[in-house]
Amino acid sequence: MAWQNRVLRVNLTSGSCSIEALQRDWAQAYLGQRGLGSKYLAEEVDPRVDPLSPENKLIIATGPLTATTAPTGGRSSAVTKGALTGAIAASNTGGMFGAELKMAGYDLLIIEGRAEQPVYLWIRDDQVEIRPADQLWGQSVWETEPWLRRELQEPQAKIASIGRAGEVGVKFACIVNDMDRAYGRSGVGTVMGSKHLKAIAVRGTRGVKVADADRFREAVSGTMAILQPSPVRKRFTSRGTHNMMDVTNQFGSLPTRNCRDVKFEGVEAINADAVRVPRRSDGKPSLQGNKACFACPIGCGRVATIDPTSGLVNGADPQGGDRGRYKLPSGGLEYETAFAFGPMCGVDDLDAINYVNFLCNEQGM
């Protein structure tokens, strides 16, 4: 196990930040992330509270393998009373944010209360500050992340933020990290917005230590020996989770036209093969490459573009500015994104699905 044995508690109402010992018996019993975060939430939050009240808490929980070299060791969970369901919400993400929080020295981050004005949290190892975020409120995720790195003069900072969706109370708003990875379920971004917390920026330099480095390396090597030659791993590396669209369509379980059907006749225009087909306009495919989260040997993340001649990415933007930003490569389609905006809506236009995916990442929903 690689616990840091520290919990960072931030009260936005009082503006206080404190470090306390991790409840090791809870960590042992509930393992970390979703389990450990849910235990803290159940012990500290009255189940009758309004999810959007200051009495609710938002917990970012890492696990015993987070920030280690264990395969997929970069994941973390956001735990709170969910805005969408009113039940315990545990939303998991990849990317780099959870590992950075752990390397800053914290197993959990517990956020309490509500700030009077918009703020962001800056964590650099033991240095923790609550800073004004007036300039950021109303900005998108895509604007917030680069602004914070410039402001903090810390290009290696990892950032989790909300977009406009979380600010205005969209019930299914997300917390987005690394521009296109998300704590995406149950309205955890809505809870963050209700606390007037725009973003959390973290830079960790402390690293992590495991109890027995030699045995741990041995265990990781054994796991990698199974993962690397696995045909399933290879398929997800080459095709991403998008690969599941063909699988579910074949077995008659692809949600189509608001679940009135279970197969989609237009699947070949939007599946994991379609993203590799060169466009007529510029000879380039939608898929530009793949990317991996922290310590992940799978690399199922996609990087995608939209046809630069499409009307979707040209002309004036109703939200202000220029649509040209959507011509740049960004996070590509995952299976659930692809089916939800594709077959579920009866849409077989790949550019349109990518565009809506970009919008959701940008606005944090």
Go through the PLM ranges and name each one.
Residues 1-92, 96-365:
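Intrinsically disordered, low-complexity segments enriched in small residues
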